[in-house]
Amino acid sequence: MCLYCWDIEPSQVNPEGPRQHHPSEVTERQLANKRIQNMQHLKKEKRRLNKRFSRPSPIPEPGLLWSS
């Protein structure tokens, strides 16, 4: 589109600045990085929970308890 304007500067023709890119063009890599971070967080959380719930704390035998 070509506008023939002699007294108007280009900044006045398009005052909002450069056109924004389509969101999918800009954030495709960002979405991939976000998915990777989310998967890493899930793995970390899974490891933490596995350590916590893998073996229950041993129940002491009744004869070993000290009574005060």
From Swiss-Prot:
Keyword vocabulary terms for this entry: Coiled coil
Biased composition (Basic residues): 41-54
Bias (Basic and acidic residues) ranges: 18-28
Entry coiled-coil feature ranges: 27-53
Residue numbers spanned by region Disordered: 11-68
Protein's recorded name: Coiled-coil domain-containing protein 179
Name of the gene: CCDC179
